[in-house]
Amino acid sequence: IKDLLEAERLYKTLPSAQQWQPNKRTSLPMVHLLLSRAYLYMEEWEKAATYANHVITNGNFHLLDLNTIKTYSEEDPSIPSYINYHSYTTSSEVIWVYGNITDVTKYVYNASASTNDHPFFRASKELMNCFDETENDLRKERYVIRSKFQIINEDNELEAMPSAFGKINVSSKAYYQPVATNDAFGRSLRLSEAYLNFCEAKAMLYKAGVANAGQEALNTLNEFRRFRFPL
């Protein structure tokens, strides 16, 4: 915490235009998000909510509306389409990018460009069912990447296997395998975490007796949901 607070102090000495830039470097909103996460772990709910709100109200970031993300190729509607959610250019939520795609996926996917090679793992039935608990959850088709490797599911139906990874850069020409490039990263700190941190912190404050905190949590959660479910 001490180091993060010192980093916050130093970043605030910079002009606002230099406190964050989409250049893969650390920044003030990155520090704010990490402080929110740390205070949440420490159960210091008010501080967690305060720092999460700093990120939420930062004008550099906006929730990405999944209603606007196509799930198929415009050239051929039969071909699924996925975007990289850990990219400054494709997601307005990204605060900081990090991590090699190969490091993220090498233990769950065989990178050989052949339909005969099997992925090591698939997204669990329990996870997939979670998306079905709420009607028309947009995250299922946009976050969970379907490989061209087909499986027989629990209903004895043939389906494209849901991969044990998502949100990353993949190739439609190589069986939707992960593609590592100099500008493609496997992980990122994103605005969406700030929303979840804020909601959890406010919910815990409500549980502790802060009367208006519950409504704040609900309002923020409903605002977040507008970008993850059909309009």
Language model features with spans:
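Active-site-adjacent substrate-recognition loops and nearby beta-strands
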Residues: 108-120
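Short, cationic low-complexity segments
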Residues: 117-140
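Acidic/polar-rich alpha-helix caps and helix-coil junctions
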Residues: 1-108, 132-231
